[in-house]
C-alpha cells in the first residue's frame, strides 16, 4: 500500500451500503469500521476512495452472507477534486474485497476503478479493466 497525496474527501460514513464490484460472491456490503482512521472526538468515521475498511456482507451467496470482510473503496458518488483541478464523481459507491494484507480476493473487477485507488493498491490496478 502506498500513501495518498493531497486532501481526501471521505464520502462513505459508517453504515453506508456499498456495491461489491468483484466476483467473490458478495453483492452488497455495509461499512462497519475504517482502518487507520484518525478523526476527531465524537465524529463518525468515514471512508473515501482508496481507503481500506471492515464491512459486513448484506447480500450475496449463502456462504458469503453475514461474514465480516475487509474491502477497499474503488468508486464513490461524492465528488472530489484531483490536484490538477478536475472534479471526479462516479455513478455508485463500490468496493472490492481484500485480505487484511491487501491482496485482492476476487479475480476480476466490474466497472471502472478510480486512479487514486489503483495507485495506492497495485494488486487492484493489476486486475482492473478500466482506470479513470
From Swiss-Prot:
InterPro entries given in the database record: Ribosomal_uL14, Ribosomal_uL14_arc, Ribosomal_uL14_CS, Ribosomal_uL14_sf
Q: What's a GO cellular component annotated to this UniProt protein?
A: cytosolic large ribosomal subunit
Q: Please give one Pfam family short name.
A: Ribosomal_L14
Keyword Nucleus in annotation: no
Q: Name one GO biological process term.
A: translation
- Keywords, sorted A to Z: Ribonucleoprotein, Ribosomal protein, RNA-binding, rRNA-binding
GO terms, molecular function: large ribosomal subunit rRNA binding; structural constituent of ribosome
Would the keyword Ribonucleoprotein be found if you checked this record's keyword annotation?
Answer: yes
The protein's job, in short, is: Binds to 23S rRNA. Forms part of two intersubunit bridges in the 70S ribosome.
The record's section on HAMAP family has: Ribosomal_uL14 (MF_01367)
By sequence similarity, the record places it as follows:
Belongs to the universal ribosomal protein uL14 family.
PANTHER family, sorted:
50S/60S RIBOSOMAL PROTEIN L14/L23, LARGE RIBOSOMAL SUBUNIT PROTEIN UL14
NCBIfam families (alphabetical) = PRK08571.1, uL14_arch
Oligomer status and interactors: Part of the 50S ribosomal subunit. Forms a cluster with proteins L3 and L24e, part of which may contact the 16S rRNA in 2 intersubunit bridges.
Task: Kindly provide the name given to this protein in its UniProt entry.
Answer: Large ribosomal subunit protein uL14
Q: Which gene encodes it?
A: rpl14
Amino acid at each position: 500500500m502506498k500513501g495518498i497525496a493531497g486532501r481526501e474527501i471521505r464520502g462513505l460514513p459508517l453504515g453506508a451500503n456499498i456495491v461489491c464490484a468483484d466476483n467473490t460472491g458478495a453483492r452488497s456490503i455495509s461499512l462497519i469500521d475504517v482502518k487507520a482512521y484518525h478523526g476527531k472526538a465524537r465524529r463518525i468515521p468515514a471512508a473515501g476512495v482508496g481507503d481500506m475498511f471492515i464491512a459486513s456482507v448484506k447480500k450475496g451467496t449463502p456462504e458469503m452472507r453475514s461474514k465480516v470482510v475487509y474491502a477497499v473503496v474503488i468508486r464513490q458518488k461524492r465528488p472530489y477534486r484531483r490536484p490538477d483541478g478536475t472534479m471526479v464523481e462516479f455513478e455508485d459507491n463500490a468496493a472490492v474485497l481484500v485480505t487484511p494484507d491487501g491482496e485482492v480476493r476476487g479475480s476480476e473487477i466490474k466497472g471502472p476503478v478510480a486512479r487514486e485507488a489503483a495507485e495506492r493498491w497495485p494488486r487492484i490496478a493489476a486486475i482492473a479493466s478500466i482506470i479513470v
